[in-house]
From Swiss-Prot:
Subcellular location: Cytoplasm, Nucleoid
SUPFAM superfamilies for the chain: YbaB-like (SSF82607)
A Pfam family matched in the record: YbaB_DNA_bd
Transmembrane stretches, start-end: none
Disulfides per UniProt: none
Subunit structure: Homodimer.
Protein name in the entry: Nucleoid-associated protein Anae109_3761
Entry keyword set: Cytoplasm, DNA-binding
Length: 103
């Protein structure tokens, strides 16, 4: 087994992973709740980039409902962003599962 070859391959994998992590900020997913009353857009780093709330969802007498809708939309977006990030990183690593790499 050629150690130099393994080291070169490890460097290539490291570079591919670093590039893929940078590209996660460019991924975009959208999730909604309440039949579209609340929409969240998130990047592959699980950062919220946009939050839209339909005026129909804003009822001062029912603040808890809006909070629940926002929570549900954010959680759905996180799930989608993690799945997209996992898929993106799997392509970058050739399908090699590396714990803690994605999302």
């Amino acid at each position: 087994m050629d150690i130099q070859y393994l080291m070169r391959q490890a460097k290539k994998l490291e570079k591919a992973m670093a590039d893929a992590k940078e590209q996660l900020a460019e991924l975009s997913v959208e999730a909604e709740s309440g039949g579209g009353l609340v929409k969240v857009t998130m990047n592959g780093k699980c950062e919220v980039t946009r939050l839209l709330v339909d005026p129909k969802a804003v009822d001062p007498a029912d603040k808890a409902m809006l909070e629940d809708l926002v929570t549900a939309a954010v959680n759905a977006a996180v799930e989608k962003a993690r799945a997209a990030a996992d898929e993106h990183m799997a392509r970058a690593t050739g399908g090699i599962k590396i714990p803690g790499v994605a999302g």
